[in-house]
């Protein structure tokens, strides 16, 4: 990392471990990373995955499956679902993305309740693991104006909430011009391994028995910038209040905030929670003049502890 005074240092469990702690979650406040070393794991076998599109009348059945996911998963499964407006039909549909790290037979057995719902589009198959990360590439093509936001959610989900969100999303798609690349996705990735790492092990404080929900709003007309932000934030607030950890604080001591989703809309105090006092101490050691403050200023007046 390049520090505020120009020094180049290593941050690891062996070298500058306090900076290593801070960089994993609050690196934007401490310097510029010029080299990253990751711990990788072999993934030699192919995985089962792909996209399914469903008509909106299948929403209750899909929510039923989602609400049982937590009790059925072994850690080898993943599921995204939400709302999209694919150009091939030009109407709002339910988009799901399946993932199974295992054989096709096992995968089809696990996801049978979804596969049996006669999806309008079924692009599931065995594929190399690295291809899974490309499945959403076509969701937001180059050009135009885009905004990402998100929040957290817990299970079970209320079907009435999902029906409201579907209607809200569909109304936006019908009301505003050239917004049909937008999407709302609930991301069910097993958290069992994630919560084995204590929240105070790094500056990243967003670990708990909950999931992320992400939205990307896409449009082209600058004059509706503020409207798109308002509509998106209103939708995220509805999900957070009615499905997030705000209703279930016993699900962990994580903040429930992911920096890449909340952007500048959350303070460092909200984002880093109990880690903020230590971060402020380390800030005085590594960046006492507060050079790196553009994203989440650790010394902003809102972050008094």
What are the language-model segments listed below?
Residues 1-305:
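Soluble FAD-dependent oxygen oxidases
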């Amino acid at each position: 990392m390049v520090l505020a005074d120009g020094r180049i240092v290593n941050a690891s469990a062996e070298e500058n471990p306090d900076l290593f702690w801070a960089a994993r979650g609050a690196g934007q406040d401490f310097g510029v990373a010029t080299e990253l070393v990751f711990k990788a794991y072999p993934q030699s076998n192919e995985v089962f995955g792909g996209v399914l599109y469903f008509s909106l009348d299948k929403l209750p059945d899909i929510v039923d499956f989602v609400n049982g996911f937590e009790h059925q998963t072994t850690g080898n499964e993943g599921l995204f679902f939400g709302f999209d407006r694919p150009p091939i039909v030009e109407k709002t549909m339910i988009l799901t993305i399946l993932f199974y790290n295992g054989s096709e037979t096992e995968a089809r057995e696990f996801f049978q309740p979804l596969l049996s719902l006669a999806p309008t589009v079924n692009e599931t198959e065995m594929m190399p693991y690295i291809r899974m990360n490309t499945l959403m590439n076509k969701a937001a093509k180059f050009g135009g104006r885009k905004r990402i936001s998100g929040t957290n959610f817990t299970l079970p989900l209320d079907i009435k909430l999902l029906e409201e969100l579907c209607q809200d999303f569909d109304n936006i798609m019908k009301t505003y011009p050239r917004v049909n690349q937008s999407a709302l996705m609930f991301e069910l990735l097993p958290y069992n391994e994630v919560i084995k790492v204590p929240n105070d092990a790094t500056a990243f404080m967003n670990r708990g028995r909950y999931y992320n929900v992400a939205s990307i709003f896409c449009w082209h007309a600058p004059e509706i910038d503020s409207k798109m932000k308002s509509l998106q934030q209103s939708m995220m607030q509805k999900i957070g209040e009615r499905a997030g950890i705000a209703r279930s604080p016993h699900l962990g001591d994580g903040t429930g905030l992911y920096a890449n989703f909340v952007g500048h809309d959350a303070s460092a105090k909200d984002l880093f929670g109990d880690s903020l006092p230590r971060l402020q101490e380390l800030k005085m050691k590594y960046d006492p003049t507060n050079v790196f403050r553009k994203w989440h200023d650790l010394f902003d007046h809102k972050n008094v502890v």
